């Protein structure tokens, strides 16, 4: 059985990295692509675990050598997925998780049309702003930087329709369970074995995150960003 590529994207501050890290512990047999980035590590991040932290010169050299399957610049920093992570995982028949932004995801969906896209949303603009402020408090990030990221998030969220599943991270434990269900549901659909009651429950849990079934929740989140940018009377 061939492996599945899972593309996971989210606006900055939506909790994507924490969810993906937890997914490592609750779903066996998953491989994780580690992106290269020119940005500095945050908090407890370690080189080779969350990212490979490289200089701009190193990144540009890899780009010139055609080592990236996708790459993008986000808030002035470069991110890229090395080709070998994907080719090696597919050769082994393993599932692979790619934690990338919407620019990189768009590139990959062209090259890997069968990849499963998962978009993680914050519950509202207000909550995302609060999360960004908490995360950046120790880094002494200027208010205008947070505002720029909020505006960027509003634009990123408009890309939700390019993804197969939509997951709202308003409760971490629930979001982890939904993310786990999505991955396992895709495995079940690829399998020819009879569906058990346990598997049926997994399929039902994933079903609520399919884009068309999450539209009411998505619309309220979109509205929260629109309301913040509309001029007040």
UniProtKB/Swiss-Prot annotation:
Regions that span the bilayer: none
SUPFAM superfamilies given for it? Answer: P-loop containing nucleoside triphosphate hydrolases
Mainly localized where?
A: cytoplasm
> What SMART domains does this protein map onto?
GuKc (SM00072)
**Residue ranges occupied by any Guanylate kinase-like domain in the UniProt entry:** 3-184
GO cellular component entries: cytosol
KW Membrane (keyword) present? no
The organism's superkingdom is given as: Bacteria
Tell me the residue numbers annotated for binding ATP: 10-17
InterPro entries xref list: GK/Ca_channel_bsu, Guanylate_kin-like_dom, Guanylate_kinase, Guanylate_kinase_CS, P-loop_NTPase
Key words of the record? ATP-binding, Cytoplasm, Kinase, Nucleotide-binding, Transferase
Extract the GO molecular function terms from the UniProt entry.
ATP binding; guanylate kinase activity
Query: Which Gene3D superfamilies does the annotation name?
Result: Guanylate Kinase phosphate binding domain (3.30.63.10), P-loop containing nucleotide triphosphate hydrolases (3.40.50.300)
The UniProt catalytic activity note for this protein reads: GMP + ATP = GDP + ADP
Mind telling me which CDD domains this protein's record contains? GMPK (cd00071)
Where is it localised?
A: Cytoplasm
So what EC number does this one have?
2.7.4.8
Family stated for the protein in its record: Belongs to the guanylate kinase family.
Role summary: Essential for recycling GMP and indirectly, cGMP.
Query: What is the name of the protein in this document?
Result: Guanylate kinase
Q: From which organism does this entry originate?
A: Koribacter versatilis (strain Ellin345)
């Amino acid at each position: 059985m061939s492996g599945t590529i899972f593309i996971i994207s989210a606006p900055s501050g939506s909790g994507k990295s924490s969810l993906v890290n937890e997914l490592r512990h609750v779903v066996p047999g998953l491989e994780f692509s580690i992106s290269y980035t020119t940005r500095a590590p945050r908090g407890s991040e370690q080189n080779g675990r969350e990212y490979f932290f490289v200089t701009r010169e190193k990144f540009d050299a890899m780009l010139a050598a055609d080592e990236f399957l996708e790459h993008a610049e986000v808030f002035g920093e470069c991110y890229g997925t090395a080709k070998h992570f994907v080719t090696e995982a597919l050769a082994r028949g393993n599932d692979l998780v790619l934690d990338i932004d919407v620019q990189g995801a768009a590139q990959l969906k062209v090259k890997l049309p069968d990849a499963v896209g998962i978009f993680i949303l914050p519950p509202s603009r207000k909550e995302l702003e609060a999360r960004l402020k908490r995360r950046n408090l120790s880094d002494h990030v200027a208010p205008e930087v947070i505002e720029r990221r909020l505006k960027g998030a509003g634009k990123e969220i408009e890309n939700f329709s390019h993804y197969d599943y939509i997951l709202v991270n308003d409760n971490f434990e629930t979001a982890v369970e939904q993310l786990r269900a999505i991955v396992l549901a895709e495995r079940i659909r690829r399998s020819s074995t009879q569906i058990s009651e346990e598997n049926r429950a997994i399929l039902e849990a994933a079903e609520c995150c399919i884009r068309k079934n999450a539209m009411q929740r998505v619309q309220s989140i979109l509205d929260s960003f629109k309301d913040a940018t509309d001029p007040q009377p």
